[in-house]
Amino acid sequence: MEKVVNNQMVSQSAVTMMLIQMLICLALPIGLAVWVIKRRSHPKKGATKIFFIGMGIFFLFAGILEGPFRGIARQFQHTPWAYALYGALLAGVFEEVGRFLGFKFIQKRIPDKINDPETPFLYGLGHGGLEMILVGSMTVLSNYLFAMLINSGSIEKVLSQTPASSRSAITAVVKQLTGMSA
């Protein structure tokens, strides 16, 4: 197996920016929700529920129900436009149906909040906030962990224990993080 890193390291500024990005991805949606619910929402009744309904709908529709259909996308991996179109349609259908049902649920369970201008904001903050936390911070966490492995000199050992089917994807990430051409 060829050596991937060749004494390359991930710069300290890149590692610092990863940590800042992770902090933003975690703190921004939660901080905004707390601020809106405590300071802005009138009446406060139902505001927290709306935020968590948004989170729940994202988790259910994008995280669980959409999952089985992602396997079909592998058929389109070698055709970028079809892969992008399928992914966009899949996300669009599941997330929009989820939003529709989420607002129907709010309309039925918290009817006095349905016309409140903060309702769609709080719902979107829950929906997008969970996406930001799960997708944004977890991606950065993965890159951060790879950076730590690279900088400690342990990445070659990890790659040697990695199944061949995953090795090329990890090698591409390593090369991207170290600034080497992929």
Task: Tell what function each PLM region has.
Residues 2-182:
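Hydrophobic alpha-helical segments at protein termini of multi-pass membrane proteins
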